[in-house]
Each structure stands twice: as structure tokens, then as C-alpha cells.
Amino acid sequence: MFGTIFNTVMIIAGSIIGGIFKKGIKDEYQDILMQAMGFAAVALGINAITQHLPDSKYPILFIVSLAIGGLLGQIINLELRFNKLVNKFSKSNLAEGLSTAVLLFCIGSLSILGPVEAALHGDYTYLLTNGMLDGITSIVLASTFGFGIAAAALVLFSWQGSIYLFAQVMESAINTDLINEITIVGGILILSSGLSILGIKKFKTLNLLPSLLIPPVVIFVIHAFGLRF
């Protein structure tokens, strides 16, 4: 868990540094930083999709995942619940920034592969690299959205910790297909978040979060019953 703890600390430290900078940044500079973060999220999302979709063995799984996950998220109304919770502590656009931070920090090859490598081989390279990148990203995000970005560190710790424990318990269930499908869906969510920040269209990205749970379930069923497609 050392790598996950390091990653978490880097996000908190970066958020503190960025939050301090925010107090001295004029509105027009904050606006341009928001645009920069929006474009960065769009680019990262497109990169994840184009990099992993060609290697997918289940080319329609991401569509099914988004449809089922979106319906579940809409029924629960995660977006509304999340915004209400965040708005209790902040009247700014922190909710939008925090949701983007959670997606950027948690959905990516390094953030998923890192805990797996640490659990199975004791290799922290991915997590340490991810921690450095997330630290820099959190500085930029917090300089735009404020100290509240640090809350994403708790989500990341829970996310990576869960993957770490799952990898230890279910070593044989972890494979490249699973990571590939999760990354494709995650890339679409990051793209959606970036478009929302840019103001192109306000997508209910958080309502799509349950989509990330569908690929593990489907792939587990496929392997458990030896299904072929």
C-alpha cells in the first residue's frame, strides 16, 4: 500500500499548494486555467479511447456498460446527490472540478495497473510515477477550483486500495482484457467531463460512473462460464 499512500499524499500536497495560488490569481487567469483543464481532460479521454479500443476483444461492451451504468446512475441520481453534498461546503464550481479530479486521478492505466503490480509483484513504479503526475495535476486543478480538490485523494485511496486487495485475493481474475475495457469506459467519462468544463454541453458524467462496474461483472461471467464471442 506504500505506493497508494504516496499517491494520496501527493494529491493532498498538490491541492494545498494550488489552493494557496488560487487566492492570488485573477478571474481571467482562473478562466483560462479552467479552459486548459477542460482541453487536457478531452485530450486524455480521447487518448484512452483511441489507445485501448482497437485492442478490445469485446467491441460493444463499452456501449452496453454506458447504457446499463447510465440507467443505474440516473435511478440513483449520483450527480444530484454529489452536487448537494459538495455545495454544502462550497458555493463555487468545486463540484465540477472535483468530479473531474476523481476521474483524472482514478481512471487511467497507471492508476489501475499500479495497485495490481504492487499487489502481485511488489513493484511500485507505476504508483510512484502516477503519484508525481497526480501531484502536478492537483496543483493546477486546485489553483482553479480551490482546496476542495484534496477530497479526491480520499476517493483515490479507496479506489486503489480496493484494486490492491482485489488483486491479492483474486489474482487469477485480473487480466489485460479487464483493464482494457475499464480504461475505454473511463476514457469516455473523462472526455465527457472535459466537454462539461469547456461549457460545450453539461453532461451528467457522475450518473455514468456505475458504467465502470459493468466490465468486471461481464468479463467475470464470460471467463467463469467459458463463453465465446
Swiss-Prot record:
Induction (UniProt): Up-regulated by mta.
Assigned GO CC terms: plasma membrane
Membrane-crossing residue ranges in chain numbering: 1-21, 32-52, 58-78, 100-120, 139-159, 178-198, 206-226
Key words, A-Z: Cell membrane, Membrane, Transmembrane, Transmembrane helix
Keyword Membrane: yes
Subcellular location as annotated: Cell membrane
Membrane protein topology class: Multi-pass membrane protein
Claim: Metal-binding is one of the keywords in the record: no
Name of this chain's protein: Uncharacterized membrane protein YdfK
Organism: Bacillus subtilis (strain 168)
Organismal lineage: Bacteria, Bacillati, Bacillota, Bacilli, Bacillales
Gene name, Swiss-Prot/TrEMBL: ydfK
